[in-house]
Amino acid sequence: LYTKPSKQSTTDLNGDNIKDIVIGGGVDSTFCNNSIMAYDGNDGSLLWKRSSRDEVFGSAIFQDLTSDGIDDVFISGRSGQLLAINGLDGSLIWDYFPYNTNPSDSGIYNFYNPQFIGDIDGDSYNDILISNGGDHAAPSFQSNRPPGHLMIISSFTGNLIV
C-alpha cells in the first residue's frame, strides 16, 4: 500500500535557475527504492532518487551543506528517518538513526516536518527543530503510548543538540 506523498518542496538542484521538485513517499513499514525523488522543474525528468527504510512523509527543507552552491535536502518520516541528502546527486550526507535496530526500541519514532531555526551550535549553519513521536507500530487500543518530544538537531552533523 503506497501512502500519500509528502508536500512537494522546491529549490534549484541543477543550477538552471528553475526550481526543481523534491517529494517523499513510500510504503508504510517497508523498505522502498523510490521513496525520495527529485524532478527537474523544467522538463519533469528525474534528477535523482533515494531509497528509504520506511515511509517518508515530511516536507523537505533546504540548505547548502556541501558548499557547492546547490541546496541540500532535509526530509523525514517513519522509523526515525531524518535524512540530509546531497541536492546535486542524491547521495546521503547523514542519517539521524543509521543503526540496524528498531528505532522504537531506542525511543525514536516518527520524525515530522523539520523547520530551520538559528545556528544553535555555532557551526554557521541553521539547525533543525523537529518533533518526534507517534509509535505507528503500537496497537491502536494501547493507551499508554510514549510521549512525543521536540528535538534540536545539528543540520551539519545530524547530531542531537537538545
Tell where the protein language model's regions lie, with residue ranges:
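Short glycine/acidic-enriched loop and turn motifs that connect beta-strands
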Residues: G26-F31, S79-G80, G134-P139
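Beta-propeller blade termini
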Residues: S6-L13, G58-L65, Y112-I120
